[in-house]
Protein backbone atom coordinates (compact mmCIF):
# COMPACT_ATOMS: atom_id res chain seq x y z
CA UNK A 1 0.00 0.00 0.00
CA UNK A 2 2.84 2.40 0.75
CA UNK A 3 4.23 1.82 -2.74
CA UNK A 4 0.84 2.63 -4.27
CA UNK A 5 0.56 5.73 -2.09
CA UNK A 6 3.96 6.91 -3.27
CA UNK A 7 3.05 6.34 -6.93
CA UNK A 8 -0.18 8.36 -6.82
CA UNK A 9 0.94 11.19 -4.50
CA UNK A 10 4.74 11.23 -4.63
CA UNK A 11 4.72 11.03 -0.83
CA UNK A 12 6.92 8.71 1.17
CA UNK A 13 5.17 9.50 4.45
CA UNK A 14 2.03 11.09 5.87
CA UNK A 15 1.65 14.60 4.38
CA UNK A 16 1.42 17.84 6.28
CA UNK A 17 -1.86 19.71 6.34
CA UNK A 18 -5.28 18.18 5.71
CA UNK A 19 -5.54 14.64 4.38
CA UNK A 20 -7.78 11.60 4.10
CA UNK A 21 -6.22 8.28 3.14
CA UNK A 22 -8.61 5.61 1.91
CA UNK A 23 -7.46 1.99 1.68
CA UNK A 24 -9.47 -1.05 0.57
CA UNK A 25 -12.84 0.61 0.96
CA UNK A 26 -12.43 2.54 4.20
CA UNK A 27 -10.82 5.69 5.55
CA UNK A 28 -7.69 4.71 7.49
CA UNK A 29 -6.13 8.07 8.36
CA UNK A 30 -7.48 11.62 8.42
CA UNK A 31 -6.46 15.07 9.54
CA UNK A 32 -8.30 18.39 9.35
CA UNK A 33 -6.76 21.82 9.95
CA UNK A 34 -8.18 25.08 11.31
CA UNK A 35 -9.01 26.14 7.73
CA UNK A 36 -9.79 22.82 6.06
CA UNK A 37 -12.34 20.42 7.51
CA UNK A 38 -12.87 16.88 6.21
CA UNK A 39 -16.08 15.13 7.25
CA UNK A 40 -17.63 11.77 6.37
CA UNK A 41 -20.74 11.76 4.19
CA UNK A 42 -23.76 10.35 6.00
CA UNK A 43 -25.93 9.34 3.04
CA UNK A 44 -23.31 7.63 0.84
CA UNK A 45 -19.69 6.56 0.72
CA UNK A 46 -17.28 9.49 0.58
CA UNK A 47 -16.26 12.75 2.22
CA UNK A 48 -16.90 16.48 2.18
CA UNK A 49 -13.99 18.90 2.21
CA UNK A 50 -14.80 22.42 3.43
CA UNK A 51 -12.14 25.07 2.81
CA UNK A 52 -12.67 28.39 4.57
CA UNK A 53 -12.69 31.65 2.60
CA UNK A 54 -9.27 33.26 2.36
CA UNK A 55 -7.31 30.07 3.08
CA UNK A 56 -3.85 30.46 1.49
CA UNK A 57 -1.00 28.10 0.65
CA UNK A 58 -2.55 25.01 2.21
CA UNK A 59 -2.96 21.56 0.70
CA UNK A 60 -5.36 18.63 0.88
CA UNK A 61 -4.32 15.06 0.04
CA UNK A 62 -7.05 12.46 -0.55
CA UNK A 63 -5.39 9.37 -2.10
CA UNK A 64 -7.12 6.01 -2.55
CA UNK A 65 -5.35 2.65 -2.65
CA UNK A 66 -6.81 -0.78 -3.39
CA UNK A 67 -4.67 -3.85 -2.80
CA UNK A 68 -7.39 -6.51 -2.42
CA UNK A 69 -8.43 -8.31 -5.58
CA UNK A 70 -12.14 -8.15 -6.44
CA UNK A 71 -12.90 -4.95 -4.52
CA UNK A 72 -15.37 -2.59 -6.21
CA UNK A 73 -16.39 0.81 -4.84
CA UNK A 74 -18.04 4.10 -5.77
CA UNK A 75 -16.92 7.09 -3.70
CA UNK A 76 -18.42 10.61 -3.69
CA UNK A 77 -16.14 13.47 -2.64
CA UNK A 78 -17.46 17.05 -2.59
CA UNK A 79 -15.19 20.10 -2.26
CA UNK A 80 -16.56 23.42 -1.02
CA UNK A 81 -13.90 26.07 -1.60
CA UNK A 82 -14.49 29.49 -0.04
CA UNK A 83 -14.03 32.85 -1.75
CA UNK A 84 -10.43 34.04 -2.21
CA UNK A 85 -8.91 30.71 -1.15
CA UNK A 86 -5.67 29.51 -2.79
CA UNK A 87 -5.07 25.80 -2.21
CA UNK A 88 -3.67 22.64 -3.79
CA UNK A 89 -5.71 19.43 -3.83
CA UNK A 90 -3.93 16.14 -4.53
CA UNK A 91 -6.09 13.12 -5.33
CA UNK A 92 -5.37 9.91 -7.18
CA UNK A 93 -5.93 6.18 -7.06
CA UNK A 94 -3.59 3.23 -7.11
CA UNK A 95 -4.81 -0.36 -7.62
CA UNK A 96 -2.61 -3.39 -7.04
CA UNK A 97 -4.38 -6.52 -8.26
CA UNK A 98 -2.58 -9.79 -7.79
CA UNK A 99 -5.69 -11.95 -8.14
CA UNK A 100 -8.14 -13.07 -10.81
CA UNK A 101 -11.14 -10.86 -9.96
CA UNK A 102 -11.51 -7.31 -11.27
CA UNK A 103 -10.82 -4.42 -8.89
CA UNK A 104 -12.65 -1.16 -9.57
CA UNK A 105 -12.71 2.35 -8.12
CA UNK A 106 -15.14 5.01 -9.35
CA UNK A 107 -14.36 8.38 -7.77
CA UNK A 108 -17.00 11.08 -8.22
CA UNK A 109 -15.46 14.48 -7.40
CA UNK A 110 -17.52 17.68 -7.34
CA UNK A 111 -15.90 21.08 -6.89
CA UNK A 112 -17.77 24.22 -5.84
CA UNK A 113 -15.16 26.97 -6.24
CA UNK A 114 -15.92 30.35 -4.66
CA UNK A 115 -15.37 33.80 -6.12
CA UNK A 116 -11.77 34.74 -6.87
CA UNK A 117 -10.52 31.40 -5.50
CA UNK A 118 -7.49 29.67 -7.02
CA UNK A 119 -7.31 25.87 -7.07
CA UNK A 120 -4.65 23.49 -8.32
CA UNK A 121 -6.03 19.94 -8.58
CA UNK A 122 -3.58 17.10 -9.21
CA UNK A 123 -4.88 13.61 -9.98
CA UNK A 124 -2.83 10.53 -10.82
CA UNK A 125 -3.98 7.00 -11.63
CA UNK A 126 -1.74 3.95 -11.43
CA UNK A 127 -2.11 0.18 -11.59
CA UNK A 128 0.17 -2.72 -10.71
CA UNK A 129 0.06 -6.46 -10.01
CA UNK A 130 0.61 -9.62 -12.02
CA UNK A 131 -2.86 -11.10 -11.51
CA UNK A 132 -5.36 -11.71 -14.30
CA UNK A 133 -7.95 -9.48 -12.63
CA UNK A 134 -8.57 -6.15 -14.33
CA UNK A 135 -7.73 -2.79 -12.74
CA UNK A 136 -10.60 -0.43 -13.56
CA UNK A 137 -10.98 3.28 -12.72
CA UNK A 138 -13.85 5.51 -13.82
CA UNK A 139 -13.31 9.01 -12.40
CA UNK A 140 -15.96 11.71 -12.74
CA UNK A 141 -15.00 15.35 -12.15
CA UNK A 142 -17.67 18.05 -11.98
CA UNK A 143 -16.49 21.64 -11.61
CA UNK A 144 -18.54 24.74 -10.75
CA UNK A 145 -16.44 27.91 -11.04
CA UNK A 146 -17.86 31.11 -9.54
CA UNK A 147 -16.95 34.59 -10.74
CA UNK A 148 -13.24 35.28 -11.35
CA UNK A 149 -12.18 31.91 -9.97
CA UNK A 150 -9.38 29.81 -11.47
CA UNK A 151 -8.87 26.05 -11.51
CA UNK A 152 -5.89 24.19 -12.89
CA UNK A 153 -6.38 20.44 -13.28
CA UNK A 154 -3.40 18.17 -13.91
CA UNK A 155 -4.48 14.58 -14.50
CA UNK A 156 -2.19 11.69 -15.42
CA UNK A 157 -2.50 7.98 -16.10
CA UNK A 158 0.85 6.44 -16.89
CA UNK A 159 0.69 2.73 -16.23
CA UNK A 160 -1.28 -0.36 -15.40
CA UNK A 161 -4.94 0.69 -15.70
CA UNK A 162 -6.81 -1.82 -17.88
CA UNK A 163 -9.98 0.17 -18.43
CA UNK A 164 -10.89 3.76 -17.69
CA UNK A 165 -13.74 6.07 -18.58
CA UNK A 166 -12.90 9.60 -17.50
CA UNK A 167 -15.79 12.06 -17.44
CA UNK A 168 -15.22 15.77 -16.86
CA UNK A 169 -17.87 18.48 -16.74
CA UNK A 170 -17.36 22.17 -16.00
CA UNK A 171 -19.59 25.23 -15.63
CA UNK A 172 -17.95 28.67 -15.74
CA UNK A 173 -19.38 31.99 -14.54
CA UNK A 174 -18.15 35.53 -15.36
CA UNK A 175 -14.37 35.77 -15.53
CA UNK A 176 -13.83 32.15 -14.50
CA UNK A 177 -10.86 30.30 -15.97
CA UNK A 178 -10.25 26.56 -16.36
CA UNK A 179 -6.96 24.99 -17.47
CA UNK A 180 -6.72 21.20 -17.92
CA UNK A 181 -3.65 19.13 -18.79
CA UNK A 182 -4.33 15.43 -19.34
CA UNK A 183 -1.43 12.98 -19.78
CA UNK A 184 -2.20 9.43 -20.72
CA UNK A 185 -0.34 6.31 -21.74
CA UNK A 186 -1.93 2.97 -22.62
CA UNK A 187 -0.35 -0.36 -23.51
CA UNK A 188 -1.33 -4.02 -23.91
CA UNK A 189 -5.07 -4.26 -24.54
CA UNK A 190 -5.98 -1.32 -22.31
CA UNK A 191 -8.87 1.04 -23.10
CA UNK A 192 -9.02 4.69 -22.09
CA UNK A 193 -11.88 7.06 -22.85
CA UNK A 194 -11.78 10.75 -21.90
CA UNK A 195 -14.82 13.00 -22.08
CA UNK A 196 -14.82 16.76 -21.50
CA UNK A 197 -17.92 18.96 -21.54
CA UNK A 198 -17.31 22.63 -20.71
CA UNK A 199 -20.08 25.23 -20.49
CA UNK A 200 -18.70 28.75 -20.61
CA UNK A 201 -21.78 30.59 -19.38
CA UNK A 202 -20.06 33.67 -17.98
CA UNK A 203 -18.82 36.78 -19.70
CA UNK A 204 -15.03 36.72 -20.25
CA UNK A 205 -14.77 33.13 -19.05
CA UNK A 206 -12.09 30.92 -20.63
CA UNK A 207 -11.13 27.26 -20.89
CA UNK A 208 -8.01 25.52 -22.20
CA UNK A 209 -8.21 21.71 -22.44
CA UNK A 210 -5.02 19.92 -23.55
CA UNK A 211 -4.56 16.14 -23.85
CA UNK A 212 -1.16 14.54 -24.48
CA UNK A 213 -1.19 10.80 -24.98
CA UNK A 214 0.68 7.74 -26.20
CA UNK A 215 -1.08 4.53 -27.28
CA UNK A 216 1.09 1.42 -27.58
CA UNK A 217 0.64 -2.26 -28.53
CA UNK A 218 -3.07 -3.16 -28.91
CA UNK A 219 -4.52 -0.40 -26.74
CA UNK A 220 -7.34 2.01 -27.60
CA UNK A 221 -7.93 5.65 -26.70
CA UNK A 222 -10.84 8.01 -27.25
CA UNK A 223 -10.68 11.78 -26.67
CA UNK A 224 -14.10 13.44 -26.80
CA UNK A 225 -14.16 17.17 -26.02
CA UNK A 226 -17.14 19.52 -26.23
CA UNK A 227 -16.69 23.23 -25.52
CA UNK A 228 -19.76 25.47 -25.44
CA UNK A 229 -19.33 29.23 -25.73
CA UNK A 230 -22.54 30.67 -24.30
CA UNK A 231 -21.26 34.23 -23.75
CA UNK A 232 -18.29 36.42 -24.65
CA UNK A 233 -15.54 33.92 -23.91
CA UNK A 234 -12.50 32.09 -25.25
CA UNK A 235 -12.05 28.33 -25.45
CA UNK A 236 -9.32 26.04 -26.74
CA UNK A 237 -9.17 22.25 -26.89
CA UNK A 238 -6.19 20.26 -28.12
CA UNK A 239 -5.50 16.54 -28.53
CA UNK A 240 -1.93 15.56 -29.37
CA UNK A 241 -1.48 11.79 -29.58
CA UNK A 242 1.32 9.42 -30.56
CA UNK A 243 0.27 6.05 -31.97
CA UNK A 244 2.52 2.97 -31.92
CA UNK A 245 2.31 -0.73 -32.83
CA UNK A 246 -1.32 -1.86 -33.38
CA UNK A 247 -2.98 0.80 -31.25
CA UNK A 248 -6.08 2.80 -32.20
CA UNK A 249 -6.90 6.41 -31.30
CA UNK A 250 -10.04 8.46 -31.94
CA UNK A 251 -10.32 12.21 -31.31
CA UNK A 252 -13.65 14.02 -31.60
CA UNK A 253 -13.32 17.65 -30.55
CA UNK A 254 -16.55 19.62 -30.88
CA UNK A 255 -17.15 23.36 -30.55
CA UNK A 256 -20.50 25.08 -30.04
CA UNK A 257 -20.56 28.88 -30.34
CA UNK A 258 -23.84 30.18 -28.97
CA UNK A 259 -22.80 33.84 -28.74
CA UNK A 260 -21.40 36.23 -31.35
CA UNK A 261 -18.37 37.00 -29.15
CA UNK A 262 -17.43 33.40 -28.40
CA UNK A 263 -13.92 32.60 -29.73
CA UNK A 264 -13.30 28.85 -29.90
CA UNK A 265 -10.41 26.79 -31.29
CA UNK A 266 -9.80 23.07 -31.53
CA UNK A 267 -6.72 21.18 -32.64
CA UNK A 268 -6.21 17.44 -33.02
CA UNK A 269 -3.07 15.65 -34.16
CA UNK A 270 -2.47 11.89 -34.21
CA UNK A 271 0.64 10.33 -35.68
CA UNK A 272 3.52 7.94 -35.24
CA UNK A 273 6.59 8.91 -33.29
CA UNK A 274 9.09 11.34 -34.81
CA UNK A 275 12.17 13.10 -33.46
CA UNK A 276 10.41 16.17 -32.08
CA UNK A 277 7.84 13.97 -30.38
CA UNK A 278 10.42 12.60 -27.95
CA UNK A 279 9.77 15.78 -25.99
CA UNK A 280 6.07 14.93 -25.72
CA UNK A 281 6.89 11.49 -24.39
CA UNK A 282 9.16 13.02 -21.80
CA UNK A 283 6.29 15.19 -20.57
CA UNK A 284 4.62 11.87 -19.70
CA UNK A 285 7.45 11.12 -17.32
CA UNK A 286 9.40 8.80 -19.60
CA UNK A 287 13.14 9.00 -20.16
CA UNK A 288 14.59 9.74 -23.58
CA UNK A 289 15.63 6.09 -23.95
Mark where each language-model region is:
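Conserved beta-strand/loop scaffold segments within soluble protein domains that form the structured core
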Residues: 19-24, 28-286
